[in-house]
């Protein structure tokens, strides 16, 4: 419910909370929200870790989008095992999320997905010389092999980014 520049959020459950206690109550039925799960690897940003992300849109077709989502902590869990107990996937904090905004949640590193870039070969070519014979520039050509290892039970999408130094 919108109230000037503020929103009131209704929690769909009832609970008794003793005086001087606090309790977290679920505010979304997340099982209905379409999420895209994917991974990113960028050595210059995260080192050798592969980071896991969830992506969704705060929109009505995504079962959200009736109002902006407030600042707060988001923790992701998955159902695990035969008893379907909750298994912690990761968490992050979010800022105010407007209606129709695309959201990317950084859930942290995932040890079950590994990326190993290996420099296989390199050469210098196109050498340029100054008038006195000193080298003033060249082109370096590198050949890389990137091994991606997925130890999860499901297929994953990994965005591998390689930053090349240059001038």
Sequence positions of predicted segments:
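Long, intrinsically disordered, low-complexity accessory segments associated with secretion
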Residues: 1-167
